[in-house]
Amino acid sequence: NSRISVRAHGLFGSVAGDDANGNNPDRNLNFESKIYEGGVQLEINFFEYYIGSRLHPVTPYIFGGAAVFFFKPYGNVGGERVELQPLLTEGQSKSYNSYAFSMPFGIGVKYSISKLIGVGAEWGMRKTTTDYLDDVSQTYYLNDPASEGAKGLASDPTLTHVAGMQRGNSRNNDWYSFAGVSLTVKIRMLKKEGCLDHQREGY
């Protein structure tokens, strides 16, 4: 209806980070993860909005839902782009799952610019069930990373840490966010005689 709706969504994006540009240059890790997300969301408009409304042509809204996403982190190791998950950079007994769940939620605004066209913008956060979007979660595990080649460089680019030293923070899972704009076109399937909603007085 004009206040509450359910929508399906699909998104693609990437997140990246580099310690050289952050608060932990001594760690010197870097990554980029491609993210493919799909899910469902409940959307609640503040006002009774629909495309073509003259009474409420603009409305803010909030949304929340559930999603599943696929991610694959890469890093620059010795000048080469390397997939990090297979390297087990924290000495895991097996690779972490590349699929995880997230809880999307956020805010947006919609505007009806004509009887048939609407535009919108929104921003949302994703709370996830993984701590490996950046391939960093727990501790270093190599006492001599220089002897492990690319695997050692991916785990400890500075080659200065020893097993057990803190590498990440496993107490908190990772988050990411999306921002975007939308264009919506209203399609009339049947032509009806009489007064349509957007032609009513006050709309």
Label the predicted regions.
Residues 114-203:
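Predominantly the C-terminal beta-signal and adjacent terminal strand-loop region
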Residues 1, 40-46, 64-68, 105-111, ...:
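Residues on the lipid-exposed face of transmembrane beta-strands in outer-membrane beta-barrel proteins
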Residues 34-38, 58, 97-103, 175-179:
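Residues that define the transmembrane beta-barrel architecture of outer-membrane proteins
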Residues 89-129:
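A contiguous pocket-lining binding segment that forms or flanks enzyme active sites
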Residues 22-31, 78-84, 135-145, 200:
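Flexible, surface-exposed loop regions and adjacent strand-edge segments
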Residues 2, 48, 56, 113-115, ...:
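Short coil turns and loop connectors of transmembrane beta-barrels in diderm outer membranes
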Residues 23-35, 88-95, 167-169:
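Extracellular loop and loop/strand-boundary signature of outer-membrane beta-barrel proteins
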